[in-house]
Amino acid sequence: MKNVTDSFVSLGHWPSAGSFGFNTDILATNLINLSVVLGVLIFFGKGVLSDLLDNRKQRILNTIRNSEELRGGAIEQLEKARSRLRKVESEAEQFRVNGYSEIEREKLNLINSTYKTLEQLENYKNETIQFEQQRAINQVRQRVFQQALRGALGTLNSCLNNELHLRTISANIGMLGTMKEITD
């Protein structure tokens, strides 16, 4: 230990005992000066350092508190957003289900309407066919009747002579006269 103190003594110059001052030469200072300086720094710096640390601690605590409040607000907003998302998903699912059921309903209505229209068209077709058949039958009947009438007239004209014709007319007039007397 003596070697260590001798090395410090040889490195620096000792101030005289009558004066007080700070030796700024680090190598020339002794342990007492260093301890005095450290003691003064600790004594006076303790308050400043503790104020700085307290301020820093308060800022950190305030920052943490603000962060917690922001976190709570963010969690609350997240829950609201999730709730809205669930609601929107539920509504979307409902719209999808309703849309599909509406589509199915419209599809069935369209199919039923188409069947009814086809049935009406089939009825109109059948009525038209029956009408055309009846018209054709009537035309055929009319032609047959006209041909039969022509044939009968031809036969009558060829078979009847004037005398037979006059007798038939007289007989018919006589029958009409008898019918008139019966009705009177």
UniProtKB/Swiss-Prot annotation:
Annotated GO CC locations: chloroplast thylakoid membrane; proton-transporting ATP synthase complex
Cellular localization per UniProt: Plastid, Chloroplast thylakoid membrane
Molecular-function GO terms, alphabetical: ATP binding; proton-transporting ATP synthase activity, rotational mechanism
Classification via Pfam families: ATP-synt_B
Entry function: F(1)F(0) ATP synthase produces ATP from ADP in the presence of a proton or sodium gradient. F-type ATPases consist of two structural domains, F(1) containing the extramembraneous catalytic core and F(0) containing the membrane proton channel, linked together by a central stalk and a peripheral stalk. During catalysis, ATP synthesis in the catalytic domain of F(1) is coupled via a rotary mechanism of the central stalk subunits to proton translocation.
Main location: plastid
Mode of membrane association: Single-pass membrane protein
Secretion signal, residue range per the UniProt entry: none
Entry protein name: ATP synthase subunit b, chloroplastic
InterPro entries, A to Z: ATP_synth_b/b'su_bac/chlpt
Transmembrane segments: 27-49
